[in-house]
Amino acid sequence: MNEVEIIDNSFLRQFETKVEGILAKIEYSSQERKVFLTKLVVPEEITKEGFKEDFIKSVLNHIQEQNLRVVPTSPQIAGFLRKNRQYKEMLPVGIRI
């Protein structure tokens, strides 16, 4: 995995990174120690192989470091979690993907 440098823009409620000046983001909302990942936006101009996966992993690692739970409401992020079961302990009790 290539670690992606992310910024938590809490004002806009999104995790951000830039690749060659192009903004990619994961929008979120938070409630009671849970982070709801609602939308992944990676412009087509970002063609770097494996970027989406590395970006999602970096965001999940950031959330994990803060001992928060994650609720993936974005289909792309839910699909990533299905394939990467090492993050399943981050899901709140009762949430299955």
Regions found by a protein language model. Give the residues of each.
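A conserved beta-turn-beta hairpin within the catalytic core of GNAT-like acetyltransferases
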Residues: 30-38
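Glycine-rich phosphate/pyrophosphate-binding loop shared by adenosine-nucleotide-utilizing enzymes
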Residues: 22-26, 35
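Conserved acetyl-CoA-binding loop-helix of GNAT-fold acetyltransferases
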Residues: 47-61
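Conserved beta-hairpin
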Residues: 13-23
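A short, internal acetyl-CoA/4′-phosphopantetheine-binding micro-motif in the GNAT/acyltransferase core
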Residues: 41-47
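C-terminal structural segments of small proteins and small subunits
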Residues: 62-97
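Structural motif
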Residues: 9-11, 31
